[in-house]
Amino acid sequence: MAQQGRNRSSNQLLVAGAAQAIDQMKFEIAQEFGVTLGADTTSRANGSVGGEITKRLVSLAQQQLGGGTSF
């Protein structure tokens, strides 16, 4: 079922230039986790990197909004 009022993809970046920062974060986290990103890597390994990116971005947003909660 199509959703009304949505005219953009959910993975479209809202801030110009954010793609480079997100990619840098992705590669840094993959290196920390010992994951080689790519088609030959398991979904679980790739997903762990994506999950960590989400955690860190939420933490950054909370700090900027004054929540101060960190993971």
UniProtKB/Swiss-Prot annotation:
The keyword Ribosomal protein does not apply. One of its GO terms (molecular function) is double-stranded DNA binding. Keywords: DNA-binding, Sporulation. GO terms for biological process: DNA topological change; sporulation resulting in formation of a cellular spore. InterPro entries: SASP_alpha/beta-type, SASP_alpha/beta-type_CS, SASP_DNA-binding, SASP_sf_alpha/beta. Pfam families: SASP. The record marks E28, I29 as: Cleavage. The keyword Transcription does not apply. SASP are bound to spore DNA. They are double-stranded DNA-binding proteins that cause DNA to change to an a-like conformation. They protect the DNA backbone from chemical and enzymatic cleavage and are thus involved in dormant spore's high resistance to UV light. SASP are degraded in the first minutes of spore germination and provide amino acids for both new protein synthesis and metabolism. Belongs to the alpha/beta-type SASP family. This is Small, acid-soluble spore protein 1. It comes from Laceyella sacchari. The lineage of its organism: Bacteria, Bacillati, Bacillota, Bacilli, Bacillales.
